[in-house]
Amino acid sequence: MDFLHLGSFVFSSRLILGTGKFSNADLMIEAIKASGAQLVTVALRRFNREQIADDLFGPLSALQGITLMPNTSGASTAREAIHAAHIARELSGSPFIKVEIHPNPQHLMPDALETWEASRILAKEGFLVMPYIPADPVLAKRLEEVGCASVMPLGSAIGSGQGLANAGMIELIIRESGIPVIVDAGLRAPSEAAAAMEMGCGAVLVNSAVAVAGNPPEMANAFAEAVRAGRRAFKAELMPKSSFALSTSPLTTFLGKKS
């Protein structure tokens, strides 16, 4: 079997699902089940025991075979992200933390310096750190060196649906990385998830593309199939590209005539 290894955890599914933007919790749960995802990310602010209508921890923790990965979305500094991570671990019991630090709400680009600092400290504290980062090969390597379990470069801006706009940089990150590379943000279509897996990504994280689809459970299942197909294609090894045509048939003879 071909498993995804993150720290001491082993997953058979390489599709990670986000939990934001769903119209209701029941639809979210249905989509998670349809996706076959085993790792699900949820914002700390959705851990709300007092306001049941806003709480996602209860419904998610009731699912069998699901590991929660809290995220620090909303943090604008390393200090805020570290504080959020401590609360999230206490509430969820999960060692995973997705470090998200994007101080500008206009573009939601991750702050590389603050992300590195928070990730360094949290990794020392024993968290399985999964940092959301710009598609920067140098930063990705630095995060690997401080003990992150994976790196999560953005395909394109959060919620933009622009797909793998950073494909070239992501390929460089994959080439140099000794930990799983997980494309996070910007994916719109299952074909883009397949393309990310064909490049050699360890997994993809999808949220908006499923949550705002016309039929979220069906779209979740489509992404699951695409991720599996892309991974199989990567393992089978794609044919090399060529700048000129290469005939699939011998050109030495045609109808008994030698060329």
Swiss-Prot record:
One of its GO terms (biological process) is thiamine diphosphate biosynthetic process. It catalyses: [ThiS sulfur-carrier protein]-C-terminal-Gly-aminoethanethioate + 2-iminoacetate + 1-deoxy-D-xylulose 5-phosphate = [ThiS sulfur-carrier protein]-C-terminal Gly-Gly + 2-[(2R,5Z)-2-carboxy-4-methylthiazol-5(2H)-ylidene]ethyl phosphate + 2 H2O + H(+). It comes from the Bacteria. One of its GO terms (cellular component) is cytoplasm. It is found in: Cytoplasm. The active site is at K98 (schiff-base intermediate with dxp). Pathway: Cofactor biosynthesis; thiamine diphosphate biosynthesis. GO terms for molecular function: thiazole synthase activity. InterPro entries: Aldolase_TIM, Thiazole_synthase_ThiG, ThiG. Its main location: cytoplasm. Keywords: Cytoplasm, Schiff base, Thiamine biosynthesis, Transferase. 1-deoxy-D-xylulose 5-phosphate binds at G159, A185, G186, N207, S208. It is an enzyme of class 2 (transferase). The keyword Transferase applies. Gene3D superfamilies: Aldolase class I. The keyword Cytoplasm applies. Its EC number is 2.8.1.10. Pfam families: ThiG. Homotetramer. Forms heterodimers with either ThiH or ThiS. PANTHER family: THIAZOLE SYNTHASE. Belongs to the ThiG family. Catalyzes the rearrangement of 1-deoxy-D-xylulose 5-phosphate (DXP) to produce the thiazole phosphate moiety of thiamine. Sulfur is provided by the thiocarboxylate moiety of the carrier protein ThiS. In vitro, sulfur can be provided by H(2)S. This is Thiazole synthase. It comes from Chlorobium phaeobacteroides (strain DSM 266 / SMG 266 / 2430).
